[in-house]
């Protein structure tokens, strides 16, 4: 439900208070989650942690930095990212949420593509939002705008 309220409440507030500050992509408004960095401002993993350090480092729970990844990474890459975050920063929680791509005929596709490299069919893409996997095609207008605004990181973005 949280992903739908980010759009619905922002839309209602924008109608009642036209000057209110929301995130937006053209006419599609949305709110970001709590004290998260606005998705348009994300540059990379390290810079996200540096930005959030002062505030989120004060918490012992109830907050998380989501690393929304363009695609899958290896277990060793994930360990390296988590180790760097835990060694260099004080934020209490981090999640790594890659986009997973699936062809209806050929299964999981590792490449960062929209069509199956074997048959050319459009891929179904899934990413974790609000704690569970959702098909990106099923996002509401606000969540789609947020997704389109967000930088999807790669392993190479770890030092940015």
PLM regions: where:
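Long, C-terminal-biased catalytic regions of enzyme "large/alpha" subunits
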Residues: 1-160
């Amino acid at each position: 439900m949280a992903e739908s309220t980010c759009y619905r409440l922002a839309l209602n507030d924008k109608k009642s208070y036209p000057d209110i500050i929301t995130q937006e992509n053209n006419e599609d408004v949305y709110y970001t989650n709590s004290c998260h960095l606005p998705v348009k401002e994300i540059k990379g993993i390290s810079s996200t942690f540096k930005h959030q350090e002062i505030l989120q480092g004060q918490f012992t729970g109830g907050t998380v930095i989501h690393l929304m990844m363009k695609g899958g990474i290896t277990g060793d890459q994930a360990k390296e990212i988590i180790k760097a975050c835990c060694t260099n920063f004080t934020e209490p929680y981090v999640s790594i949420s890659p986009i997973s791509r699936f062809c209806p005929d050929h299964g999981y596709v590792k490449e960062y593509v929209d069509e199956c490299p074997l048959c050319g069919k459009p891929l179904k893409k899934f990413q974790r939002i609000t704690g569970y996997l959702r098909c990106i095609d099923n996002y509401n207008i606000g969540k789609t705008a947020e997704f389109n605004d967000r930088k999807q990181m790669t392993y190479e973005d770890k030092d940015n």
